[in-house]
Structures are given as structure tokens and as C-alpha cells.
Amino acid sequence: MASPSSHLLFLVLLCSIPSSYLTASTIPVSVFNTIPHSDPFQRLSHLAFTSIARARHIKNAQNAPTSTTHLFPYSGAYSISLSFGTPPQSIPMLLDTGSSFSWFPCTKRYVCRHCSVSSTGISSFIPKESSSAKILGCMNPKCGWVHQSFDPNTSCQECQLQKTNCTQICPPYIILYGLGSTGGIPMVETLNMPHKKISDFLVGCSLFSSGQPAGVAGFGKGVSSLPSQLGIKKFSYCLVSHKFDNTPKSGFLSMDPESDSNKKTGNLSYTPMLKNPVRAGTSALSDYYYVGLRRITVGGQKVKVSYQQLSPDSDGNGGTIVDSGSTFTYMNQAVFDMVSNAFSEQVKEYKRAETMESQTGLRPCFDVTGHDAVKMPALTLHFKGGAEMALPLENYFFAVDDVQKEVVCLSMVTDNTLLGPELISGPSVILGNFLMQNFHVEYDLTNERFGFRQQSCS
């Protein structure tokens, strides 16, 4: 069986070109690694822990005096390389469909604490070396994109006194996420795409971070997201398998500026994107892509998950979102227990690997030592409209090679007491990128539908 020691690199994709400027295109790029652990058990445990931390942050989404994104460090996430400034500076940024605000490490004095690499080894944008870099003004409407409750009449007092040529800047941001934070100054800069320059692109110039060595390219549904600022009507990606994490292989990201209003991509199964719930006093849930997961089957047998768990209520409790920034798929305790128990009850050929379960926090795990071909019950997700996602084994079981034995673990997580009591609010299911390996995934923003098909992405 393949060793997991290479399973946790950050794979790099490069996006194509924005709306109304070009036709869609794709460009492959290289890989980089910031995983802090070399031991496979520590790596697997770390992924499980950070997947839970990210899920807790997504579920606890709320407006605050500071801007918030939904990212955690060392997640096994995928990234894109974007070029900003005049002359251009290329910066790797994590592809995140669970948040909208984009930011990058900024200035030569950028400090990253509790990171796996030193601050000097992190790619940072240098505003002084760009003639097009501008700090965002306080009266600029985009300041309200950063601070959702922002009121320029009360926050920009200097500009109220000095109506013309006001130099007051948009307030700094503090971004909170599952296991850390980042902070900096909002700015507008030229985004350099392969054949076009997009001026005045809103991006955060982060001066410090904790536990976050790379910036974020926000692909959520908010007005500050990259697709929204570029007017993209459709974007898609294909995530290469994590087994290629130690190779130059990469997937791709494509952004389509000229999407036909009704045309479907060949051989894709589609399910409607659901209307985002509105939690009282907050618009934080508006970034997420909700889809209608209607049924889960294990080995062809329906898992008896309640409708209330799979459908969001008016307060944003329950439902399913797609999140490229999460590694392992998260399920609320009630949903997870039914799914994991279904595997435990149906798998009779292999013994439970309880030591591995205690070491990693994943369950169930099975000892498959001596078996050339591992067989597990099929896992299928059934969506609204009839779309079915039949998953290959590598997308829902993680292989761990020990010196003495070979073990596979269900690559899904649920909340636990390590980070406090379980949060029952927010989405019940968060579909992570491990589940989407070797799937062509499409976000049709015009028609509000989510499409997918299985294919090789390498």
C-alpha cells in the first residue's frame, strides 16, 4: 500500500483569466510543503485536528468588529499562484471556497509566529516595489467589503471634516480562523492575469500572522471574492490525488468569463445551490456554497440521517456546504456516528485498529495487513435533483503504512471535546477536498448549480 508520508503537501494550481476579457484557460504550476510533522501518525492526527478546528470556525461564523475568514494552517489545501503589482510579484495563495476576502503576506517585515517555516522563507508582497499599490481610503465603498458593519459617516470622521483630498485610510483588519489569526491593512492593487491587468483589486496586506504561512484567495459567494471582483460567471477545478503530493503533478483551476447562460458542461451531474440561510444579526453564512445532500448510502444501504440534519433551517443550523479549504469531510456527531457505524457493521473481513484510532482520532480504522486488495463498502452521496457522487475508495479511506502493519481509516471527522463542547449550530456536513480528489468540480454562479464528474486530474 502507498505510504502516507507524502500525502500532505500543498498542491499548487494556477487560475486562468477573468470575465469579459478572455476565454477560459488553465495553467499548471509547482508544489510546496509546509506540513509541520514528518511522522505519518502525527501528520494524520494533525490533519484530523485541524479539520475539526476549521469546521468549528465555519459553524461558529458570526459578524464581528474585525473581518473574519475561515482558514486553518497546514490543512493539506490546494493553492493558486497569483501575480500582483507593477512590476508583477507572484504570491502563492490558498484556494478557499469557504471565504471571500483575499489577503497575502506583506512587506519585508512580515512576521509569522507558530509557523512551520521562518518568516524570511515566506513569499511576501512588497508594496514599496509596486507603483500601482494603494492603501484603501476610508471613504472607498470597498472598505465596507472588509468591515461588514462599517459606517463611513461615523468611522471616517477626518473625511467628514475634510470633504476633499481626505487621507484617512480604511481601518486595519484582524482575521480570525480556526487555530490562528492574521492582521493588516486593506489595499487596492493591480491583479495581473495572463493577458489582462485588473486594476484596483481589493486585497489585504497582512503584516503579521499566527500559524498561517500562506495567504488566501477567497472564492466564496461574497462581494469581495475573486470571482465576484472579476465578474466570473463560472469556475471549476480538478484536484489531483493526494498520493501525488510528493511529485510535480498538479491539478487545474479554470475561470470562464463567457459562460453560456444555460449550457451545461458535458457529462457533469448537477445539483442546485441552495439559498443561503440568514442567521439573526449576521451575514457570515453568506460566503458558503450550500448544496442539497439528500441521502447517504454505505454499501448500498441508506444511512438513516434525519432531514433536519441535512437541510439548513432559517437560523443556519444544519445543511451541507462545499469547502475547498477543508481537508477531511466534517459531519456533526449525530451524522458521523451513523455513517461510521454503518462501516463498522458492514466490514467483517478486517479487524479494528483501535491503537490507530486512539493515535489519530479517526474512526473506524481497520488492520488490512497481508491483503493485496482492500475492499470496503461503497460510499455514495445523493443530492437534490438526482445527482449521485459515487466515491472511489481513496476519497474516503486514508491508507497508513506502519513498520509492522497496514491500516486504513475513514477520512472523515466529527467534533470532540479537545476544542470544547460540540457546536450544534452551522452546517451539519462540510465536504472537504479529500472527498473531491480526481473530480472535476464546477461552480455555475449564473445558474446557481454545482456540477461534478469523476476524472483523472493529473
Residue ranges and their predicted role:
Residues 179, 195-196, 300-302, 386:
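Detector for glycine-centered tight turns/loop "hinges" at secondary-structure junctions
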Residues 106-109, 226, 336-343:
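Short active-site loop/helix that positions an aromatic residue
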Residues 2-40, 74, 85-87, 95-100, ...:
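Aspartic protease catalytic domain
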Residues 162-170, 178-288, 403, 407-457:
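Aspartic protease core domain of the pepsin/retropepsin superfamily
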Residues 99-103, 216-219:
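FAD-binding core of FAD-dependent oxidoreductases
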Residues 2-93, 101-185, 247-252, 261-291, ...:
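Disordered propeptide/prodomain
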Residues 99-102, 109-111, 209-210, 243-245, ...:
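Solvent-exposed loop/turn segments at secondary-structure junctions
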